Design a protein with these regions (language model features):
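Structured, helix-rich domain cores that form ligand/interaction pockets
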Residues: 1-252
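Conserved small/polar residues in nucleotide/adenosyl-binding loops
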Residues: 254-261
């Protein structure tokens, strides 16, 4: 589910003194440098040092698995990937502030993805735009819903080997992008929160709600994969994800604890 994540951490927030301008450049492939700025990459992750601030941004799934179209990161995989990133940079990324979260899933469709855009009509508070045929956005100041043709994106990125696995199917990807993480979640979110099952549930719920509140239409020429209601939608994708992450048990435990608190 997690895709692009933006980590931001300052030297002053670390328990042990580290100079990013001295420590980071030897651990990455450098693209540009100046007296107080270094930009480079660690695999697919963009690494930027601005004086005493370290910014790391990229697909956590692609960093850990090498691709971001088929599998999801379990809660434990998220923890492993953040620990791996921490070890490679020698910086505790669990302490970093999270400034952006993208969460998404790919769907196998009957038709090419763009023919479904006319069925997704309106979402209150969001500006709908379809500038390019293969992509549909619902945008506002703190978040964005994005529906796009995953295979087209992979062709642009020249992911030829991965495309072989998908050549016989149409792949639609739906992402919910949290642009103002602190505002949406009502407080600072740190790297360690990403592998908290309770926080993962909150993110998943917003991804789910984002799709469900869109007003839907119907195009008779299209054999649309339609979700008849919440139960059908949950069976098709949310249940699969929650089952993989063991989130049903977490949800039941969380609900039980909340009920106990109310009764007491």
């Amino acid at each position: 589910m997690y895709d692009t994540i933006k980590f931001v951490i300052k030297e002053s927030e670390l328990d042990n003194a580290i100079c990013f301008l001295e420590e980071i450049p030897c651990r990455i492939s450098i693209k540009s440098t100046s007296s107080n700025r270094v930009v480079g990459f660690l695999k697919n992750m963009k690494i930027e040092v601005r004086n005493t601030t370290l910014i790391v941004q990229g697909s956590l799934l692609k960093y850990f698995k090498g691709y971001n179209y088929a599998e999801c990161l379990s809660v434990w995989d998220v923890r492993k990937s953040i620990n791996k990133l921490s070890n490679e940079l020698n910086v505790p990324m669990r302490q970093a502030v999270i400034n952006r979260i993208d969460i998404g899933i790919c769907f196998s469709m009957v038709n090419v993805p763009w023919v479904y855009w006319d069925c997704l009509l309106h979402s209150d508070g969001y500006f709908r735009s379809n500038i390019k045929q293969e992509t549909l956005y619902f945008d506002k100041y703190d978040s964005q819903l994005c529906f796009y043709d995953k295979k087209t994106e992979m062709k642009k990125n020249r992911e030829v080997e991965n495309l072989e696995c998908l050549k016989k199917i149409n792949v639609l990807r739906y992402e919910f992008r949290f642009k103002k993480v602190t505002s949406i979640f009502g407080g600072v979110v740190r790297g360690a929160d990403l592998y908290s099952p309770v926080f993962y549930l909150r993110v998943l719920q917003k991804w789910y709600d984002g799709y469900m509140i869109i007003q839907k239409g119907f195009v008779s020429e299209v054999d649309l994969l339609r979700f008849g209601g919440k139960k059908e939608f949950q069976r098709s994708c949310v249940a699969l994800v929650m089952g993989q992450f063991n989130l049903y048990e977490v949800c039941l435990l969380y609900t039980s604890d909340a009920a106990d608190e109310r009764s007491s």
